[in-house]
Amino acid sequence: MIYQLMDNCNVIVSQSYEYDKLLELKSLRKFISILNEKLNSNFVYYIFWGEISDEQYLLSKTEKIDQSCHNILFWIGDEKGCIPSDETFQRFDFIFKVHLKDKDAIRTENGINVYRKGLYHFPLLTIDDVPELPVLSFEDRKYNLYYCGNLNKNRLPLYLSLKKKPQIKELITNFLLHNNLRGGDKLFNLCFKGKTFDFSNYYKNSYVKFYSGFNNGDNYKTYAHFLQNSKIVLSPKGFYSTECFRFYEAMRQGCIVITEELPHVECYQDAPCITVKSWKQLPDILINIDLYNTFSPSIIRKFYDDKLSINGIAQYVYNRILSI
Protein backbone atom coordinates (compact mmCIF):
# COMPACT_ATOMS: atom_id res chain seq x y z
CA MET A 1 0.00 0.00 0.00
CA ILE A 2 1.01 3.61 -0.58
CA TYR A 3 0.36 6.29 2.04
CA GLN A 4 0.96 10.01 1.60
CA LEU A 5 3.01 11.24 4.52
CA MET A 6 3.41 14.76 3.10
CA ASP A 7 2.74 16.47 -0.23
CA ASN A 8 6.09 15.34 -1.62
CA CYS A 9 6.57 12.17 0.42
CA ASN A 10 4.95 8.76 0.03
CA VAL A 11 5.36 5.75 2.29
CA ILE A 12 5.25 2.41 0.49
CA VAL A 13 4.58 -0.52 2.81
CA SER A 14 5.22 -4.03 1.52
CA GLN A 15 2.47 -6.60 1.89
CA SER A 16 4.20 -8.31 4.80
CA TYR A 17 4.06 -5.17 6.99
CA GLU A 18 1.42 -2.83 8.40
CA TYR A 19 1.61 0.96 8.16
CA ASP A 20 0.24 1.46 11.68
CA LYS A 21 3.08 -0.61 13.12
CA LEU A 22 5.86 1.53 11.66
CA LEU A 23 7.86 2.32 14.80
CA GLU A 24 9.50 5.55 13.61
CA LEU A 25 6.69 7.17 11.61
CA LYS A 26 6.63 10.45 13.58
CA SER A 27 10.41 10.68 13.40
CA LEU A 28 10.31 10.16 9.64
CA ARG A 29 7.68 12.87 9.25
CA LYS A 30 9.84 15.34 11.17
CA PHE A 31 12.91 14.25 9.20
CA ILE A 32 11.19 14.93 5.86
CA SER A 33 9.93 18.29 7.15
CA ILE A 34 13.50 19.33 7.95
CA LEU A 35 14.68 18.20 4.51
CA ASN A 36 11.92 20.25 2.90
CA GLU A 37 13.20 23.32 4.71
CA LYS A 38 16.70 22.69 3.38
CA LEU A 39 15.94 21.61 -0.20
CA ASN A 40 13.74 23.04 -2.93
CA SER A 41 10.35 21.69 -3.95
CA ASN A 42 11.72 19.67 -6.87
CA PHE A 43 12.61 16.79 -4.54
CA VAL A 44 10.20 13.90 -4.05
CA TYR A 45 10.73 11.37 -1.28
CA TYR A 46 9.73 7.73 -1.10
CA ILE A 47 10.02 5.76 2.13
CA PHE A 48 9.91 2.02 1.54
CA TRP A 49 9.31 -0.40 4.40
CA GLY A 50 10.21 -3.87 3.24
CA GLU A 51 12.78 -6.61 2.76
CA ILE A 52 14.91 -7.10 -0.34
CA SER A 53 12.47 -9.86 -1.31
CA ASP A 54 9.80 -7.14 -1.54
CA GLU A 55 11.73 -5.11 -4.11
CA GLN A 56 9.40 -5.96 -7.00
CA TYR A 57 6.53 -4.57 -4.94
CA LEU A 58 8.43 -1.29 -4.61
CA LEU A 59 9.07 -1.20 -8.34
CA SER A 60 5.44 -1.94 -9.17
CA LYS A 61 4.28 0.95 -6.99
CA THR A 62 6.72 3.43 -8.55
CA GLU A 63 6.25 2.57 -12.24
CA LYS A 64 4.84 6.02 -13.02
CA ILE A 65 7.39 7.98 -11.05
CA ASP A 66 7.92 11.54 -12.32
CA GLN A 67 11.46 11.54 -13.71
CA SER A 68 11.46 15.33 -14.05
CA CYS A 69 11.86 15.51 -10.26
CA HIS A 70 14.75 14.45 -8.05
CA ASN A 71 13.44 11.18 -6.62
CA ILE A 72 14.98 10.02 -3.35
CA LEU A 73 14.35 6.62 -1.78
CA PHE A 74 14.73 5.90 1.93
CA TRP A 75 14.66 2.13 2.37
CA ILE A 76 13.99 1.01 5.93
CA GLY A 77 13.22 -2.33 7.55
CA ASP A 78 15.69 -4.56 5.69
CA GLU A 79 17.94 -5.70 8.54
CA LYS A 80 19.96 -7.91 6.18
CA GLY A 81 21.14 -4.76 4.40
CA CYS A 82 21.00 -6.19 0.88
CA ILE A 83 21.95 -4.11 -2.16
CA PRO A 84 19.03 -3.12 -4.45
CA SER A 85 18.86 -4.16 -8.10
CA ASP A 86 20.01 -2.05 -11.04
CA GLU A 87 16.36 -1.36 -11.89
CA THR A 88 15.86 0.37 -8.55
CA PHE A 89 19.00 2.46 -9.06
CA GLN A 90 17.74 3.54 -12.47
CA ARG A 91 14.48 4.72 -10.96
CA PHE A 92 15.84 6.85 -8.10
CA ASP A 93 18.49 9.56 -8.05
CA PHE A 94 19.55 8.73 -4.50
CA ILE A 95 18.99 5.63 -2.37
CA PHE A 96 19.54 5.85 1.39
CA LYS A 97 19.29 2.38 2.92
CA VAL A 98 19.51 1.04 6.46
CA HIS A 99 21.91 -1.68 7.61
CA LEU A 100 24.38 -1.48 4.72
CA LYS A 101 27.34 -3.80 5.33
CA ASP A 102 31.09 -3.21 5.21
CA LYS A 103 31.50 -6.10 2.76
CA ASP A 104 29.35 -4.33 0.15
CA ALA A 105 31.43 -1.15 0.07
CA ILE A 106 33.45 -0.64 -3.11
CA ARG A 107 36.14 1.20 -1.11
CA THR A 108 36.69 3.27 2.03
CA GLU A 109 37.67 6.94 2.21
CA ASN A 110 38.98 8.32 5.50
CA GLY A 111 37.62 5.25 7.24
CA ILE A 112 34.11 5.59 5.79
CA ASN A 113 32.51 3.11 3.41
CA VAL A 114 31.80 4.22 -0.13
CA TYR A 115 29.09 2.22 -1.87
CA ARG A 116 28.10 2.14 -5.52
CA LYS A 117 27.05 5.43 -7.09
CA GLY A 118 23.76 6.71 -5.71
CA LEU A 119 23.74 4.46 -2.62
CA TYR A 120 24.22 5.78 0.91
CA HIS A 121 23.82 4.45 4.40
CA PHE A 122 20.71 5.60 6.27
CA PRO A 123 20.74 5.73 10.09
CA LEU A 124 17.92 4.17 12.10
CA LEU A 125 16.36 7.09 14.01
CA THR A 126 14.55 6.22 17.27
CA ILE A 127 11.25 4.56 18.12
CA ASP A 128 8.50 7.18 18.40
CA ASP A 129 6.99 5.76 21.59
CA VAL A 130 10.26 5.74 23.55
CA PRO A 131 10.14 9.08 25.41
CA GLU A 132 13.17 11.35 25.49
CA LEU A 133 13.97 12.25 29.10
CA PRO A 134 16.34 14.79 30.68
CA VAL A 135 19.98 13.68 30.62
CA LEU A 136 21.32 12.97 34.11
CA SER A 137 24.91 13.09 35.35
CA PHE A 138 26.50 9.72 36.08
CA GLU A 139 26.41 10.58 39.78
CA ASP A 140 22.62 10.86 39.65
CA ARG A 141 22.08 7.51 37.93
CA LYS A 142 20.94 4.53 39.99
CA TYR A 143 22.13 1.69 37.76
CA ASN A 144 25.69 0.88 36.77
CA LEU A 145 24.66 -1.55 34.03
CA TYR A 146 21.46 -2.05 32.03
CA TYR A 147 20.23 -4.53 29.49
CA CYS A 148 16.77 -5.90 28.87
CA GLY A 149 16.16 -7.68 25.60
CA ASN A 150 15.46 -10.77 23.59
CA LEU A 151 17.89 -13.67 23.88
CA ASN A 152 18.38 -14.60 20.24
CA LYS A 153 21.16 -16.87 19.00
CA ASN A 154 23.50 -13.96 18.23
CA ARG A 155 23.27 -12.79 21.84
CA LEU A 156 24.30 -16.07 23.42
CA PRO A 157 27.97 -14.95 23.69
CA LEU A 158 26.79 -11.90 25.66
CA TYR A 159 24.67 -14.14 27.90
CA LEU A 160 27.67 -16.39 28.59
CA SER A 161 29.96 -13.43 29.34
CA LEU A 162 27.50 -12.16 31.96
CA LYS A 163 26.72 -15.49 33.59
CA LYS A 164 29.20 -16.39 36.31
CA LYS A 165 28.94 -20.17 35.91
CA PRO A 166 27.38 -21.22 32.59
CA GLN A 167 26.08 -24.74 32.27
CA ILE A 168 27.86 -27.29 30.08
CA LYS A 169 24.86 -27.56 27.75
CA GLU A 170 24.90 -23.76 27.28
CA LEU A 171 28.58 -23.84 26.33
CA ILE A 172 27.96 -26.73 23.93
CA THR A 173 25.07 -24.79 22.36
CA ASN A 174 27.30 -21.79 21.79
CA PHE A 175 30.02 -23.99 20.25
CA LEU A 176 27.57 -25.65 17.86
CA LEU A 177 26.02 -22.34 16.80
CA HIS A 178 29.36 -20.56 16.42
CA ASN A 179 30.66 -23.33 14.16
CA ASN A 180 27.34 -23.74 12.32
CA LEU A 181 27.10 -27.40 13.35
CA ARG A 182 24.00 -29.53 13.26
CA GLY A 183 21.99 -29.62 16.45
CA GLY A 184 22.79 -26.07 17.55
CA ASP A 185 19.34 -24.63 16.83
CA LYS A 186 17.56 -27.53 18.52
CA LEU A 187 19.72 -27.32 21.63
CA PHE A 188 19.31 -23.53 21.76
CA ASN A 189 15.52 -23.88 21.77
CA LEU A 190 15.75 -26.56 24.44
CA CYS A 191 17.91 -24.40 26.70
CA PHE A 192 16.46 -20.94 26.13
CA LYS A 193 13.15 -20.79 24.26
CA GLY A 194 10.31 -19.35 26.34
CA LYS A 195 12.57 -18.64 29.30
CA THR A 196 13.60 -15.47 31.14
CA PHE A 197 17.01 -14.96 32.76
CA ASP A 198 17.77 -12.29 35.36
CA PHE A 199 21.42 -11.44 36.03
CA SER A 200 20.72 -8.25 37.98
CA ASN A 201 22.13 -9.67 41.20
CA TYR A 202 25.38 -10.66 39.50
CA TYR A 203 26.49 -7.04 39.19
CA LYS A 204 26.16 -4.27 41.75
CA ASN A 205 23.34 -1.78 41.11
CA SER A 206 22.41 -3.35 37.79
CA TYR A 207 19.35 -4.43 35.83
CA VAL A 208 20.17 -7.19 33.35
CA LYS A 209 17.45 -9.44 31.94
CA PHE A 210 17.07 -11.69 28.91
CA TYR A 211 13.67 -12.77 27.70
CA SER A 212 12.33 -14.87 24.84
CA GLY A 213 10.70 -13.24 21.83
CA PHE A 214 10.79 -9.78 20.21
CA ASN A 215 9.39 -6.78 22.09
CA ASN A 216 8.41 -8.79 25.19
CA GLY A 217 10.53 -6.92 27.73
CA ASP A 218 10.04 -3.59 29.48
CA ASN A 219 7.39 -1.26 28.09
CA TYR A 220 8.69 1.86 26.37
CA LYS A 221 8.25 4.21 29.34
CA THR A 222 9.98 1.81 31.72
CA TYR A 223 12.73 1.23 29.17
CA ALA A 224 13.30 4.99 28.83
CA HIS A 225 13.43 5.33 32.63
CA PHE A 226 16.15 2.67 32.82
CA LEU A 227 18.15 4.33 30.06
CA GLN A 228 17.95 7.68 31.82
CA ASN A 229 19.13 6.12 35.09
CA SER A 230 21.86 3.81 33.74
CA LYS A 231 25.53 4.57 33.27
CA ILE A 232 26.37 1.66 30.95
CA VAL A 233 23.98 0.11 28.42
CA LEU A 234 24.70 -3.09 26.50
CA SER A 235 23.75 -3.05 22.82
CA PRO A 236 24.24 -6.53 21.30
CA LYS A 237 23.57 -7.63 17.75
CA GLY A 238 20.00 -8.26 16.61
CA PHE A 239 19.01 -11.11 14.32
CA TYR A 240 21.20 -9.85 11.47
CA SER A 241 22.69 -6.44 12.22
CA THR A 242 24.72 -4.80 14.97
CA GLU A 243 22.82 -1.56 14.32
CA CYS A 244 19.77 -1.19 16.54
CA PHE A 245 17.39 1.40 17.97
CA ARG A 246 18.81 0.74 21.45
CA PHE A 247 22.15 2.30 20.44
CA TYR A 248 20.46 5.54 19.36
CA GLU A 249 18.13 5.74 22.36
CA ALA A 250 20.92 5.07 24.85
CA MET A 251 23.20 7.66 23.23
CA ARG A 252 20.32 10.14 23.37
CA GLN A 253 20.21 9.66 27.14
CA GLY A 254 23.98 10.11 27.46
CA CYS A 255 24.73 6.48 28.36
CA ILE A 256 28.03 4.70 27.79
CA VAL A 257 27.06 2.15 25.16
CA ILE A 258 28.96 -1.11 24.74
CA THR A 259 28.31 -2.45 21.27
CA GLU A 260 29.61 -4.97 18.80
CA GLU A 261 31.43 -3.57 15.78
CA LEU A 262 29.28 -1.18 13.76
CA PRO A 263 29.63 -0.59 10.01
CA HIS A 264 32.18 1.99 8.91
CA VAL A 265 29.68 4.69 8.01
CA GLU A 266 29.67 8.40 8.74
CA CYS A 267 27.15 8.47 11.57
CA TYR A 268 29.22 6.13 13.76
CA GLN A 269 32.69 7.47 13.03
CA ASP A 270 34.43 8.49 16.29
CA ALA A 271 31.31 7.69 18.31
CA PRO A 272 31.95 7.99 22.08
CA CYS A 273 31.08 4.37 22.81
CA ILE A 274 32.91 1.13 23.58
CA THR A 275 33.20 -1.39 20.75
CA VAL A 276 33.98 -5.04 21.43
CA LYS A 277 35.13 -7.67 18.96
CA SER A 278 34.06 -10.35 21.43
CA TRP A 279 31.77 -10.24 24.45
CA LYS A 280 34.55 -12.07 26.32
CA GLN A 281 36.06 -8.60 26.75
CA LEU A 282 33.06 -7.45 28.79
CA PRO A 283 34.11 -8.54 32.32
CA ASP A 284 37.38 -6.59 32.07
CA ILE A 285 35.57 -3.53 30.72
CA LEU A 286 33.05 -3.51 33.55
CA ILE A 287 35.76 -3.32 36.23
CA ASN A 288 37.51 -0.39 34.53
CA ILE A 289 37.02 2.49 36.94
CA ASP A 290 38.35 5.00 34.38
CA LEU A 291 35.27 4.64 32.17
CA TYR A 292 33.44 7.49 33.85
CA ASN A 293 36.44 9.77 33.38
CA THR A 294 36.77 8.86 29.70
CA PHE A 295 33.12 9.48 28.84
CA SER A 296 30.56 12.01 30.00
CA PRO A 297 26.80 12.26 29.37
CA SER A 298 27.22 15.69 27.80
CA ILE A 299 29.84 14.50 25.28
CA ILE A 300 27.76 11.44 24.37
CA ARG A 301 24.61 13.52 23.99
CA LYS A 302 26.40 16.08 21.83
CA PHE A 303 27.52 13.32 19.47
CA TYR A 304 23.94 12.08 19.30
CA ASP A 305 22.66 15.58 18.51
CA ASP A 306 25.27 16.08 15.78
CA LYS A 307 25.15 12.67 14.09
CA LEU A 308 22.23 10.48 15.23
CA SER A 309 19.34 12.83 15.97
CA ILE A 310 16.64 13.66 13.44
CA ASN A 311 18.31 17.02 12.78
CA GLY A 312 21.74 15.44 12.51
CA ILE A 313 20.53 12.78 10.06
CA ALA A 314 18.70 15.38 7.97
CA GLN A 315 21.91 17.43 7.76
CA TYR A 316 23.85 14.33 6.71
CA VAL A 317 21.36 13.53 3.92
CA TYR A 318 21.36 17.17 2.81
CA ASN A 319 25.17 17.18 2.64
CA ARG A 320 25.24 13.96 0.60
CA ILE A 321 22.72 15.32 -1.90
CA LEU A 322 24.58 18.62 -2.30
CA SER A 323 27.91 16.83 -2.77
CA ILE A 324 26.77 15.28 -6.06
Question: Which residues does each PLM region occupy?
Answer:
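A charged, aromatic-enriched C-terminal amphipathic alpha-helix characteristic of glycosyltransferases
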Residues: 287-324
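A signal for specific C-terminal beta-sheet/loop modules enriched in small/flexible residues
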Residues: 110-111, 285, 289
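Nucleotide-sugar donor-binding catalytic core of glycosyltransferases
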Residues: 1-275, 306-321
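Catalytic cores of eukaryotic secretory-pathway lumenal/extracellular enzymes that build
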Residues: 279-282
